[in-house]
Amino acid sequence: MFIKTLRLLSSSVGCTLIGAAVTTSCSNDDLLQNARESHRVVEDSMTFSGVSQEEVPTRTIIYDHTKGSGASVIWRNTDKILVKDNAGQWRQSATATFPIASKKSNAVFTVAGSYTSPTHAVVYTNKGLIGSQPQVEIKKVQTQTAPNNFDHAGESGDCGVATAQKVGSDYKFTLEHKASFICLIPRSSNTYVQHSKITKIEISSEDDIAGVYNIASDGTLTLASGGSKTITLTTGSGFAIDNTTADMSKNASYAVIAPGRHSLRIRYWLRNTADNPKGPIDGTVTKYVTLTFVPGSIHDVTANLSINDYGGTNYYMWDAKANYWSGHEWNSADPWQPTKFLTTSSTNYPKPGSDSYTPNRTAAGSLEASTSHFAALPNANEMAWYVLKGDPHYDADELWSTMGYLYKGGMWFKKKANIAGFTDSHHPDNASTDLRNTYTRVAKAASLQLPVITEMNQYFYLPFSGYYSTGSNNYKFQTAGLTGYYWTSSAVPSNQTGSYALTINKGLAALQEASPSNGLIVRPFE
């Protein structure tokens, strides 16, 4: 993880803003630039005349940020400051005014009260003063109106503290920003992503990253109320994501976030109107990162948004030598394989005598698959361990693709190495039951929450990849995005017409009987 820091420090008075970039290389800290403000004091009222160098202006609209560098900051005409008067009471200023209308780096604030001490404390915050404790609200819902635009910084929770020093007839100070900032810079070479727009970004943590915070005299933020572990950044009509390299003008997205070390789940919400068989689809591409968010720092997080593609050539009859549409796959020169619904008059399906066809068994009883690709699958006992002890979690929104179309929905299971007691020899709750010899349906309700962020590497994902059905449905492609079906290596022992398969959908993971003539997924489990 690479962090590069740019400090904008004043030589006399001004605003401190640190920019931190996060990519994937080494680290470096460099480059100082100056900014300054001056402040004029009058007994019984105080006028703050904020002055900044034009190339490095101060304050609450953050702009001109570049990846790996800091940013420029200017005042808004709605900005106010808090100043502690001679009696130790916080006073809120009037809104900013600008001596030169076109120069937003220069602002004047007027504050009622008496100010004659050598120093006075100054606070900038988005929250009006209630009582004697300055607070800031880091918003759990933030809105960005255009790409690479951080006009909402002040409204979303930017804050700062300073000690105003009396110099002659003026008070001068350097404002230190005490919230942290994240800048998300996505790119993609994936066709489905490039056909989409980013409509919002969810940033989630295992600890609070938003809420109402008390601002200590040194600027330390302490959660007071309304803690939220998620920040949602909305992007209006959406940002394009058709850039293969980082292009901040396309989609750089900013949020204010509480300082501290956070392990984040960042879910980019995409709207795609071109690639789902049923019409527009809204779903997520998810990234994970752990960072230490330094107060006053902009952390650049780049991301290559990709979507897992499941090729479509691993649908099989149970224990068949070849896939359901062998030689005529959807992407072959002579495709028979339906990628959507097949017409009912079609006769293109696995026929007796072909490698894609499995004859019916002649008798019931225990039977394990003979083909190598089926022998590599979990047997019935192992699949029961995944169901009952694998902590299944439903994921409604993660996007995936197959056979030229975009879908969403699937389930997370713990990997075998993370399931205590995992064995291939017996039922997880009954050591005397071997499901290869005794048929038992096994089911468990799936959690509707995603797994814990810091434990995601213990899980693997199965998409709701549908199946090819027989009988009255006449070999149609069914339920993609709604249900997933995965073969085991074990036949059902109680009859000659069934085999064990995993079925997963929104609320349930189940090990149960399926017809061997159906085309279900064959894939090894982790």
Model segments located where?
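Sec-type signal peptide cleavage vicinity
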Residues: 2-388, 394-396, 400
